[in-house]
């Protein structure tokens, strides 16, 4: 044993909290934005995040879906790591072929997400990944898109969950893996 003892390995939660940037008053005054891009920019942290998100769902999905935009980063890495396909859930008007559309409420107004109708065959299983779970509206809309396609949702994985916004309630009945709950 040398003079320098090996440091204990940092947990995934500790890595995320260390790397996540907190931006006050963004995108508007009174809002505290949690920027996960420094987590994704760190290769070891990104690998640890992806591994931690998919591990509870091992063998339970045929493809990984990412919600625009940061969900794409997670889904592509997870699909590659697990040898499955990646599916993109996009904002309305961004996909070129026939789509399913799901409208959902935002704090101020509404939005819509779309999924290509032929991305996955009916009966397939999909793991849905996104960066943050807040109110659950975006992920619930994503789940409805896959239901329209006859695709089963294996579960949800998110890096950061804002627990005070009760997003889990909108996703009742599905397994949710969140790496950090604030």
Curated annotation (Swiss-Prot):
Source organism superkingdom: Bacteria
Catalysed reaction equations from the record: AMP + diphosphate = 5-phospho-alpha-D-ribose 1-diphosphate + adenine
GO CC terms of this entry: cytoplasm
Pathway linked to the protein: Purine metabolism; AMP biosynthesis via salvage pathway; AMP from adenine: step 1/1
EC number assigned by the record: 2.4.2.7
GO molecular function, one term: adenine binding
Disulfide bonds: none
Gene Ontology biological-process annotations: adenine salvage; AMP salvage; purine ribonucleoside salvage
Enzyme class: transferase
Location relative to the cell: Cytoplasm
Keywords tagged on the record: Cytoplasm, Glycosyltransferase, Purine salvage, Transferase
Family to which the UniProt record says this protein belongs: Belongs to the purine/pyrimidine phosphoribosyltransferase family.
Known role: Catalyzes a salvage reaction resulting in the formation of AMP, that is energically less costly than de novo synthesis.
Subunit structure of this chain's protein: Homodimer.
UniProt protein name: Adenine phosphoribosyltransferase
Species whose genome carries this gene: Renibacterium salmoninarum (strain ATCC 33209 / DSM 20767 / JCM 11484 / NBRC 15589 / NCIMB 2235)
High-level lineage: Bacteria, Bacillati, Actinomycetota, Actinomycetes, Micrococcales
């Amino acid at each position: 044993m040398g003079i320098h003892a090996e440091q204990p390995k940092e947990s995934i939660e500790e890595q995320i909290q260390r790397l996540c940037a907190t931006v006050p008053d963004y995108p508007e005054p009174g809002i505290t934005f949690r920027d996960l891009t420094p987590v994704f920019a760190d290769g070891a942290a990104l690998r640890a995040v992806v591994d931690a998100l998919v591990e509870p769902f091992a063998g339970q999905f045929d493809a990984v879906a990412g919600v625009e935009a940061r969900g794409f980063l997670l889904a592509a890495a997870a699909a590659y790591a697990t040898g499955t396909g990646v599916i993109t859930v996009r904002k309305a008007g961004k996909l070129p072929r026939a789509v399913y559309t799901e409208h959902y409420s935002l704090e101020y107004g509404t939005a819509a997400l779309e999924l290509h109708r032929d991305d996955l065959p009916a009966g397939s299983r999909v793991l849905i990944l996104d960066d943050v779970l807040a109110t659950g509206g975006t992920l619930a809309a994503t789940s409805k898109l896959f239901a329209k396609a006859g695709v089963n949702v294996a579960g949800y994985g998110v890096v950061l969950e804002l627990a005070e916004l009760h997003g889990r309630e909108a996703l009742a009945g599905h397994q949710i893996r969140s790496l950090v709950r604030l």
